[in-house]
Amino acid sequence: MAFNFNWSPLMADASFYTRAQDLLTAALNKSPKPPIIVDDIIVTELNLGSIPPELEILEIGDLAEDRFRGIFKMSYSGDAFLTLKTRVQANPLNTYLLTRPSFATPRPLAAATPLTIPLQITLSDFKLSGFVILVFSKQKGITVVFRNDPLESLKVSSTFDSIPFVRDFLQKEIEAQLRILFMDELPAIIHRLSLRLWVPEYRAGEELQTQTESANGEGPGQDPLASPPQDPVDALGNALNESEIESLSLDSSVETHSLFSQKNLLRLAALTDSQRTLSLFTPSIREVVYRAWTSPSDQTDASGGVTSPFSPVLSRTQSQVGSMSSFPDSASMVSNQSRSSTPSHTFSGYGLSLGAGRHSKAHARKRKKRVVDLRRPKTTDDAPSVSDESAFTESTSTPSICSAPMPVLDEQTDDPVTPPLSPDRDLHLPAIPERHGMSISRPALRREIASEMIRDTAESKPSSNPVGQAIQDEDLSATPRAAVRAHGASVLEKEKQATGSSAGSSRQLPSTILPFINDSPTGRVVDQALVERLAGEIARRMRDEKFLASNACGPFWDRHSQEESPPPAYGH
């Protein structure tokens, strides 16, 4: 079986060549070009020649009036030629530097200056040989698929034929590109051309698409502000209604570019905050200070004045576990600030000691255990030894509270930011230098109880009240250790009353006993009932403080929620 191909009509149709040139230009610029080619490759001339290819039928799979499918062996050695035009880079150093990373190559000043030269390439003397699968259909066009690489050789003529290196380089690069063209791009080009020739619907749709592209390419560009977002907001984040949007224009004085979506603004805000938290998905928590917000200068924030709980200082927070004075509530903090009479002593009680320091107080001194020793000393001195607590004794010639000299105690404080005690609490008592605490510290409570008891005794006649004695006995029975101490105190009082006349009047008392001694005009001693009540009250307070110390590591609000029981009633 033989076929006759009429090759002359393909050479006579001018529109066919124009369309083929456009398709070849698009195909050559579709794939990545080598760095030496700095411009688009344009097909300026195309000619299929007068010699047709030779086809040998190997297999026919389907044959009908409107379709055909078969396998051919094709060989071509004709006079077809193709002319291309582009621009190339003549400076190889510029091409080398563009294809290498900047940190690994030198940066010359003038040696790498680009130099582009126009290039014209003519491809001729094609020699093709390969197996072709051909499928023809009037509805689907022609499909040509090459089983193998059909390109054997071709001749490349260019402007740089006089330079052997450039000529060989162009020959190699163009051959590689043509192999890709025959295997991938040429079947698609032939298929589109066949559809344009035999399928009118495809031709009409292609013309409509061309008109649409030309219409879109002409005229002014689209205004991005012509269609505002769905949820527009102004520069301050306030939502805008439709009337406000219509009043805005490109010529108005209002900054129209600030009309952005609220969602986009939130994303930008999250991106801005990511440098503080190193994460875009960190949830925002109210009244929380992030560590990344602080700086090394935050250590001086504590000396800058009284800080309001509603405007905290941005500094790192340190939770000091086990320190009762490190967790003041707002009420005690405000009361201490309002009662403070010294303007130089300022502190910040917001949160967990904001600005108090960068490091925890695990290395600080341990809490001292204060023990009252009521045993009778073996020496001739009858005064009991007191270690960091208040023991209440009386003497026949005790000095007056108002006239007693103030002893000087050299004691260092544990907490450098502890505020001074309120002067309102010590109106009737001298301010004894001792460790000052917060509103829940123990020395303040002890002096308050003592001042109330002395005030009650001054108003009423000192007497032994059976009701008060019963309450005291009930309190002492609940705590055996306190009862032993109270019993020791009563025995000590009886012995001191018996030997009170022989005691010297110039005996110096400890500084912690001075606030609790009441001096009478006649020099008479304090009533024994008052001393017993004081000893019992101190024992009860020590028991409560021991209970609070055992719960120091518990939750903060649990300790404050425990209401203190009122002191026992005293007889008048």
From Swiss-Prot:
Gene Ontology biological process terms from the UniProt entry: mitochondrial genome maintenance; mitochondrion-endoplasmic reticulum membrane tethering; phospholipid transport
- Where the record annotates domain SMP-LTD, the positions are 1-195
Membrane topology listed for this record? Multi-pass membrane protein
Q: Keywords on this record?
A: Lipid transport, Lipid-binding, Membrane, Mitochondrion, Mitochondrion outer membrane, Transmembrane, Transmembrane beta strand, Transport
Biased composition (Basic and acidic residues) is annotated at: 371-381
Q: Which GO terms describe its molecular function?
A: lipid binding
Q: Where is the composition biased (Polar residues)?
A: 296-347, 387-401, 498-511
- Give the PROSITE patterns listed for this entry: SMP (PS51847)
- List locations, semicolon-separated: Mitochondrion outer membrane
Q: Where is the composition biased (Basic residues)?
A: 358-370
Region described as Disordered: spans on this chain: 208-236, 296-405, 455-518, 551-572
Q: Which family does it belong to?
A: Belongs to the MDM34 family.
Entry's free-text remark on domains: Lacks alpha-helical transmembrane segments, suggesting that it resides in the membrane via beta-sheet conformations similar to those predicted for other outer membrane proteins and porin.
How does it associate, per the subunit comment? Component of the ER-mitochondria encounter structure (ERMES) or MDM complex, composed of mmm1, mdm10, mdm12 and mdm34.
Task: State what protein this is by name.
Answer: Mitochondrial distribution and morphology protein 34
Q: Which organism is it from?
A: Neosartorya fischeri (strain ATCC 1020 / DSM 3700 / CBS 544.65 / FGSC A1164 / JCM 1740 / NRRL 181 / WB 181) (Aspergillus fischerianus)
